[in-house]
Amino acid sequence: MSKIWFITGASRGLGRHFVQAAVAQGDKVVATARNIDGVKDLAVKHGDAVLPLQLDVTDRTAAVSAVQEATAHFGRLDVVVNNAGFGLFGAIEEITEQQARDQIEVNYLGVLWVTQAVLP
């Protein structure tokens, strides 16, 4: 039986590779990204195996809505990959308060919101 994956940050890098690997083994994927244009081509390439959704993981309401839409479309979710995130590079004393807050919003709260949304 194939699995249904929910992958954040699927527009590039590891997220995109996770999508391609899951589809290659016969699974279906909800591919999310802040900019939906970054994942639409995956649906074109893989057809019904990929549902592209726009999702800014820092928006708790959007995370709940995306999970609801994904579940309505595929009937369930089996695997969640909280891949959306980014790093800050450079001297720590040069990181601004806003940069730190943005990183915490995505890398910590984004994971929390998506995980809470998929739990029963």
Task: Give residue spans per PLM region.
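Conserved hydrophobic beta-strands of the Rossmann-like cofactor-binding core
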Residues: 4-7, 80-81
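Conserved glycine-rich cofactor-binding loop
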Residues: 11-12
